[in-house]
């Protein structure tokens, strides 16, 4: 569905605030999975990922929608701050694959080191799930969303 190259440059690579990927790529039923490939070592100094183990069981907290051309971040029920006392860093060497459940809260800090921290991410959804029409990320008619079934293009 979506891929990104993330270039967290030395000294200027900014913080990515706590979020759940399902907020931005919602399906019915929820099915987004993130694959985060470490193209370089990721550690505390250069802004590694942090996660909140088990929080994905609590459901999706927010939804980013496109309505009449306007983007909106909406709360899904009562939204309390994440309990950050349970956060853990994911320090990983180059070449590591981190798999993220779509409801797992995660973030990364500023790169305070003299080294870059580059990563490649790929977000996938289930072919049996419905990609919602008001998700912020939509493809135009010249580039429709395509699914794979049994490894073959549909």
Task: Tell what function each PLM region has.
Residues 21-32, 85-86, 92, 115-116:
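A short beta-loop-beta micro-motif enriched in histidine and acidic residues
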Residues 62-65, 97-99, 103-154:
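Non-heme Fe(II)/2-oxoglutarate
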Residues 1-51:
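Conserved double-stranded beta-helix
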Residues 20-23, 36-37, 84-86, 104-107:
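Glycine-rich, charged/polar anion/phosphate-binding loops
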Residues 4, 34-38, 87-89, 97-99, ...:
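Conserved hydrophobic/aromatic beta-strand scaffold that supports enzyme active sites
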Residues 4, 21, 55, 103, ...:
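Anionic group-transfer/hydrolysis microenvironments
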Residues 42-105:
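Double-stranded beta-helix
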Residues 9, 43, 58, 126-128:
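Feature marks short, surface-exposed loop/turn motifs that line or immediately flank catalytic pockets
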């Amino acid at each position: 569905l979506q891929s990104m190259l993330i270039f967290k440059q030395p000294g200027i690579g900014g913080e990515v605030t706590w979020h759940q990927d399902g907020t931005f790529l919602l399906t019915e039923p929820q099915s987004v999975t993130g694959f985060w490939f470490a193209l370089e070592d990721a550690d505390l100094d250069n802004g590694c990922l942090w996660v909140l183990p088990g929080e994905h069981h609590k459901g999706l907290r927010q939804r980013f929608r496109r309505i009449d051309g306007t983007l909106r971040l909406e709360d899904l029920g009562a939204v309390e701050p994440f309990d950050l006392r349970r956060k853990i860093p994911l320090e990983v060497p180059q070449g590591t694959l981190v798999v993220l459940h779509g409801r797992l809260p995660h973030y990364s800090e500023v790169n305070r080191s003299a080294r870059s921290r580059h990563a490649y991410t790929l977000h996938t959804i289930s072919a049996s799930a419905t990609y919602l029409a008001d998700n912020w990320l939509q493809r135009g008619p010249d580039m429709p969303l395509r699914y794979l079934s049994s490894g073959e293009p549909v």
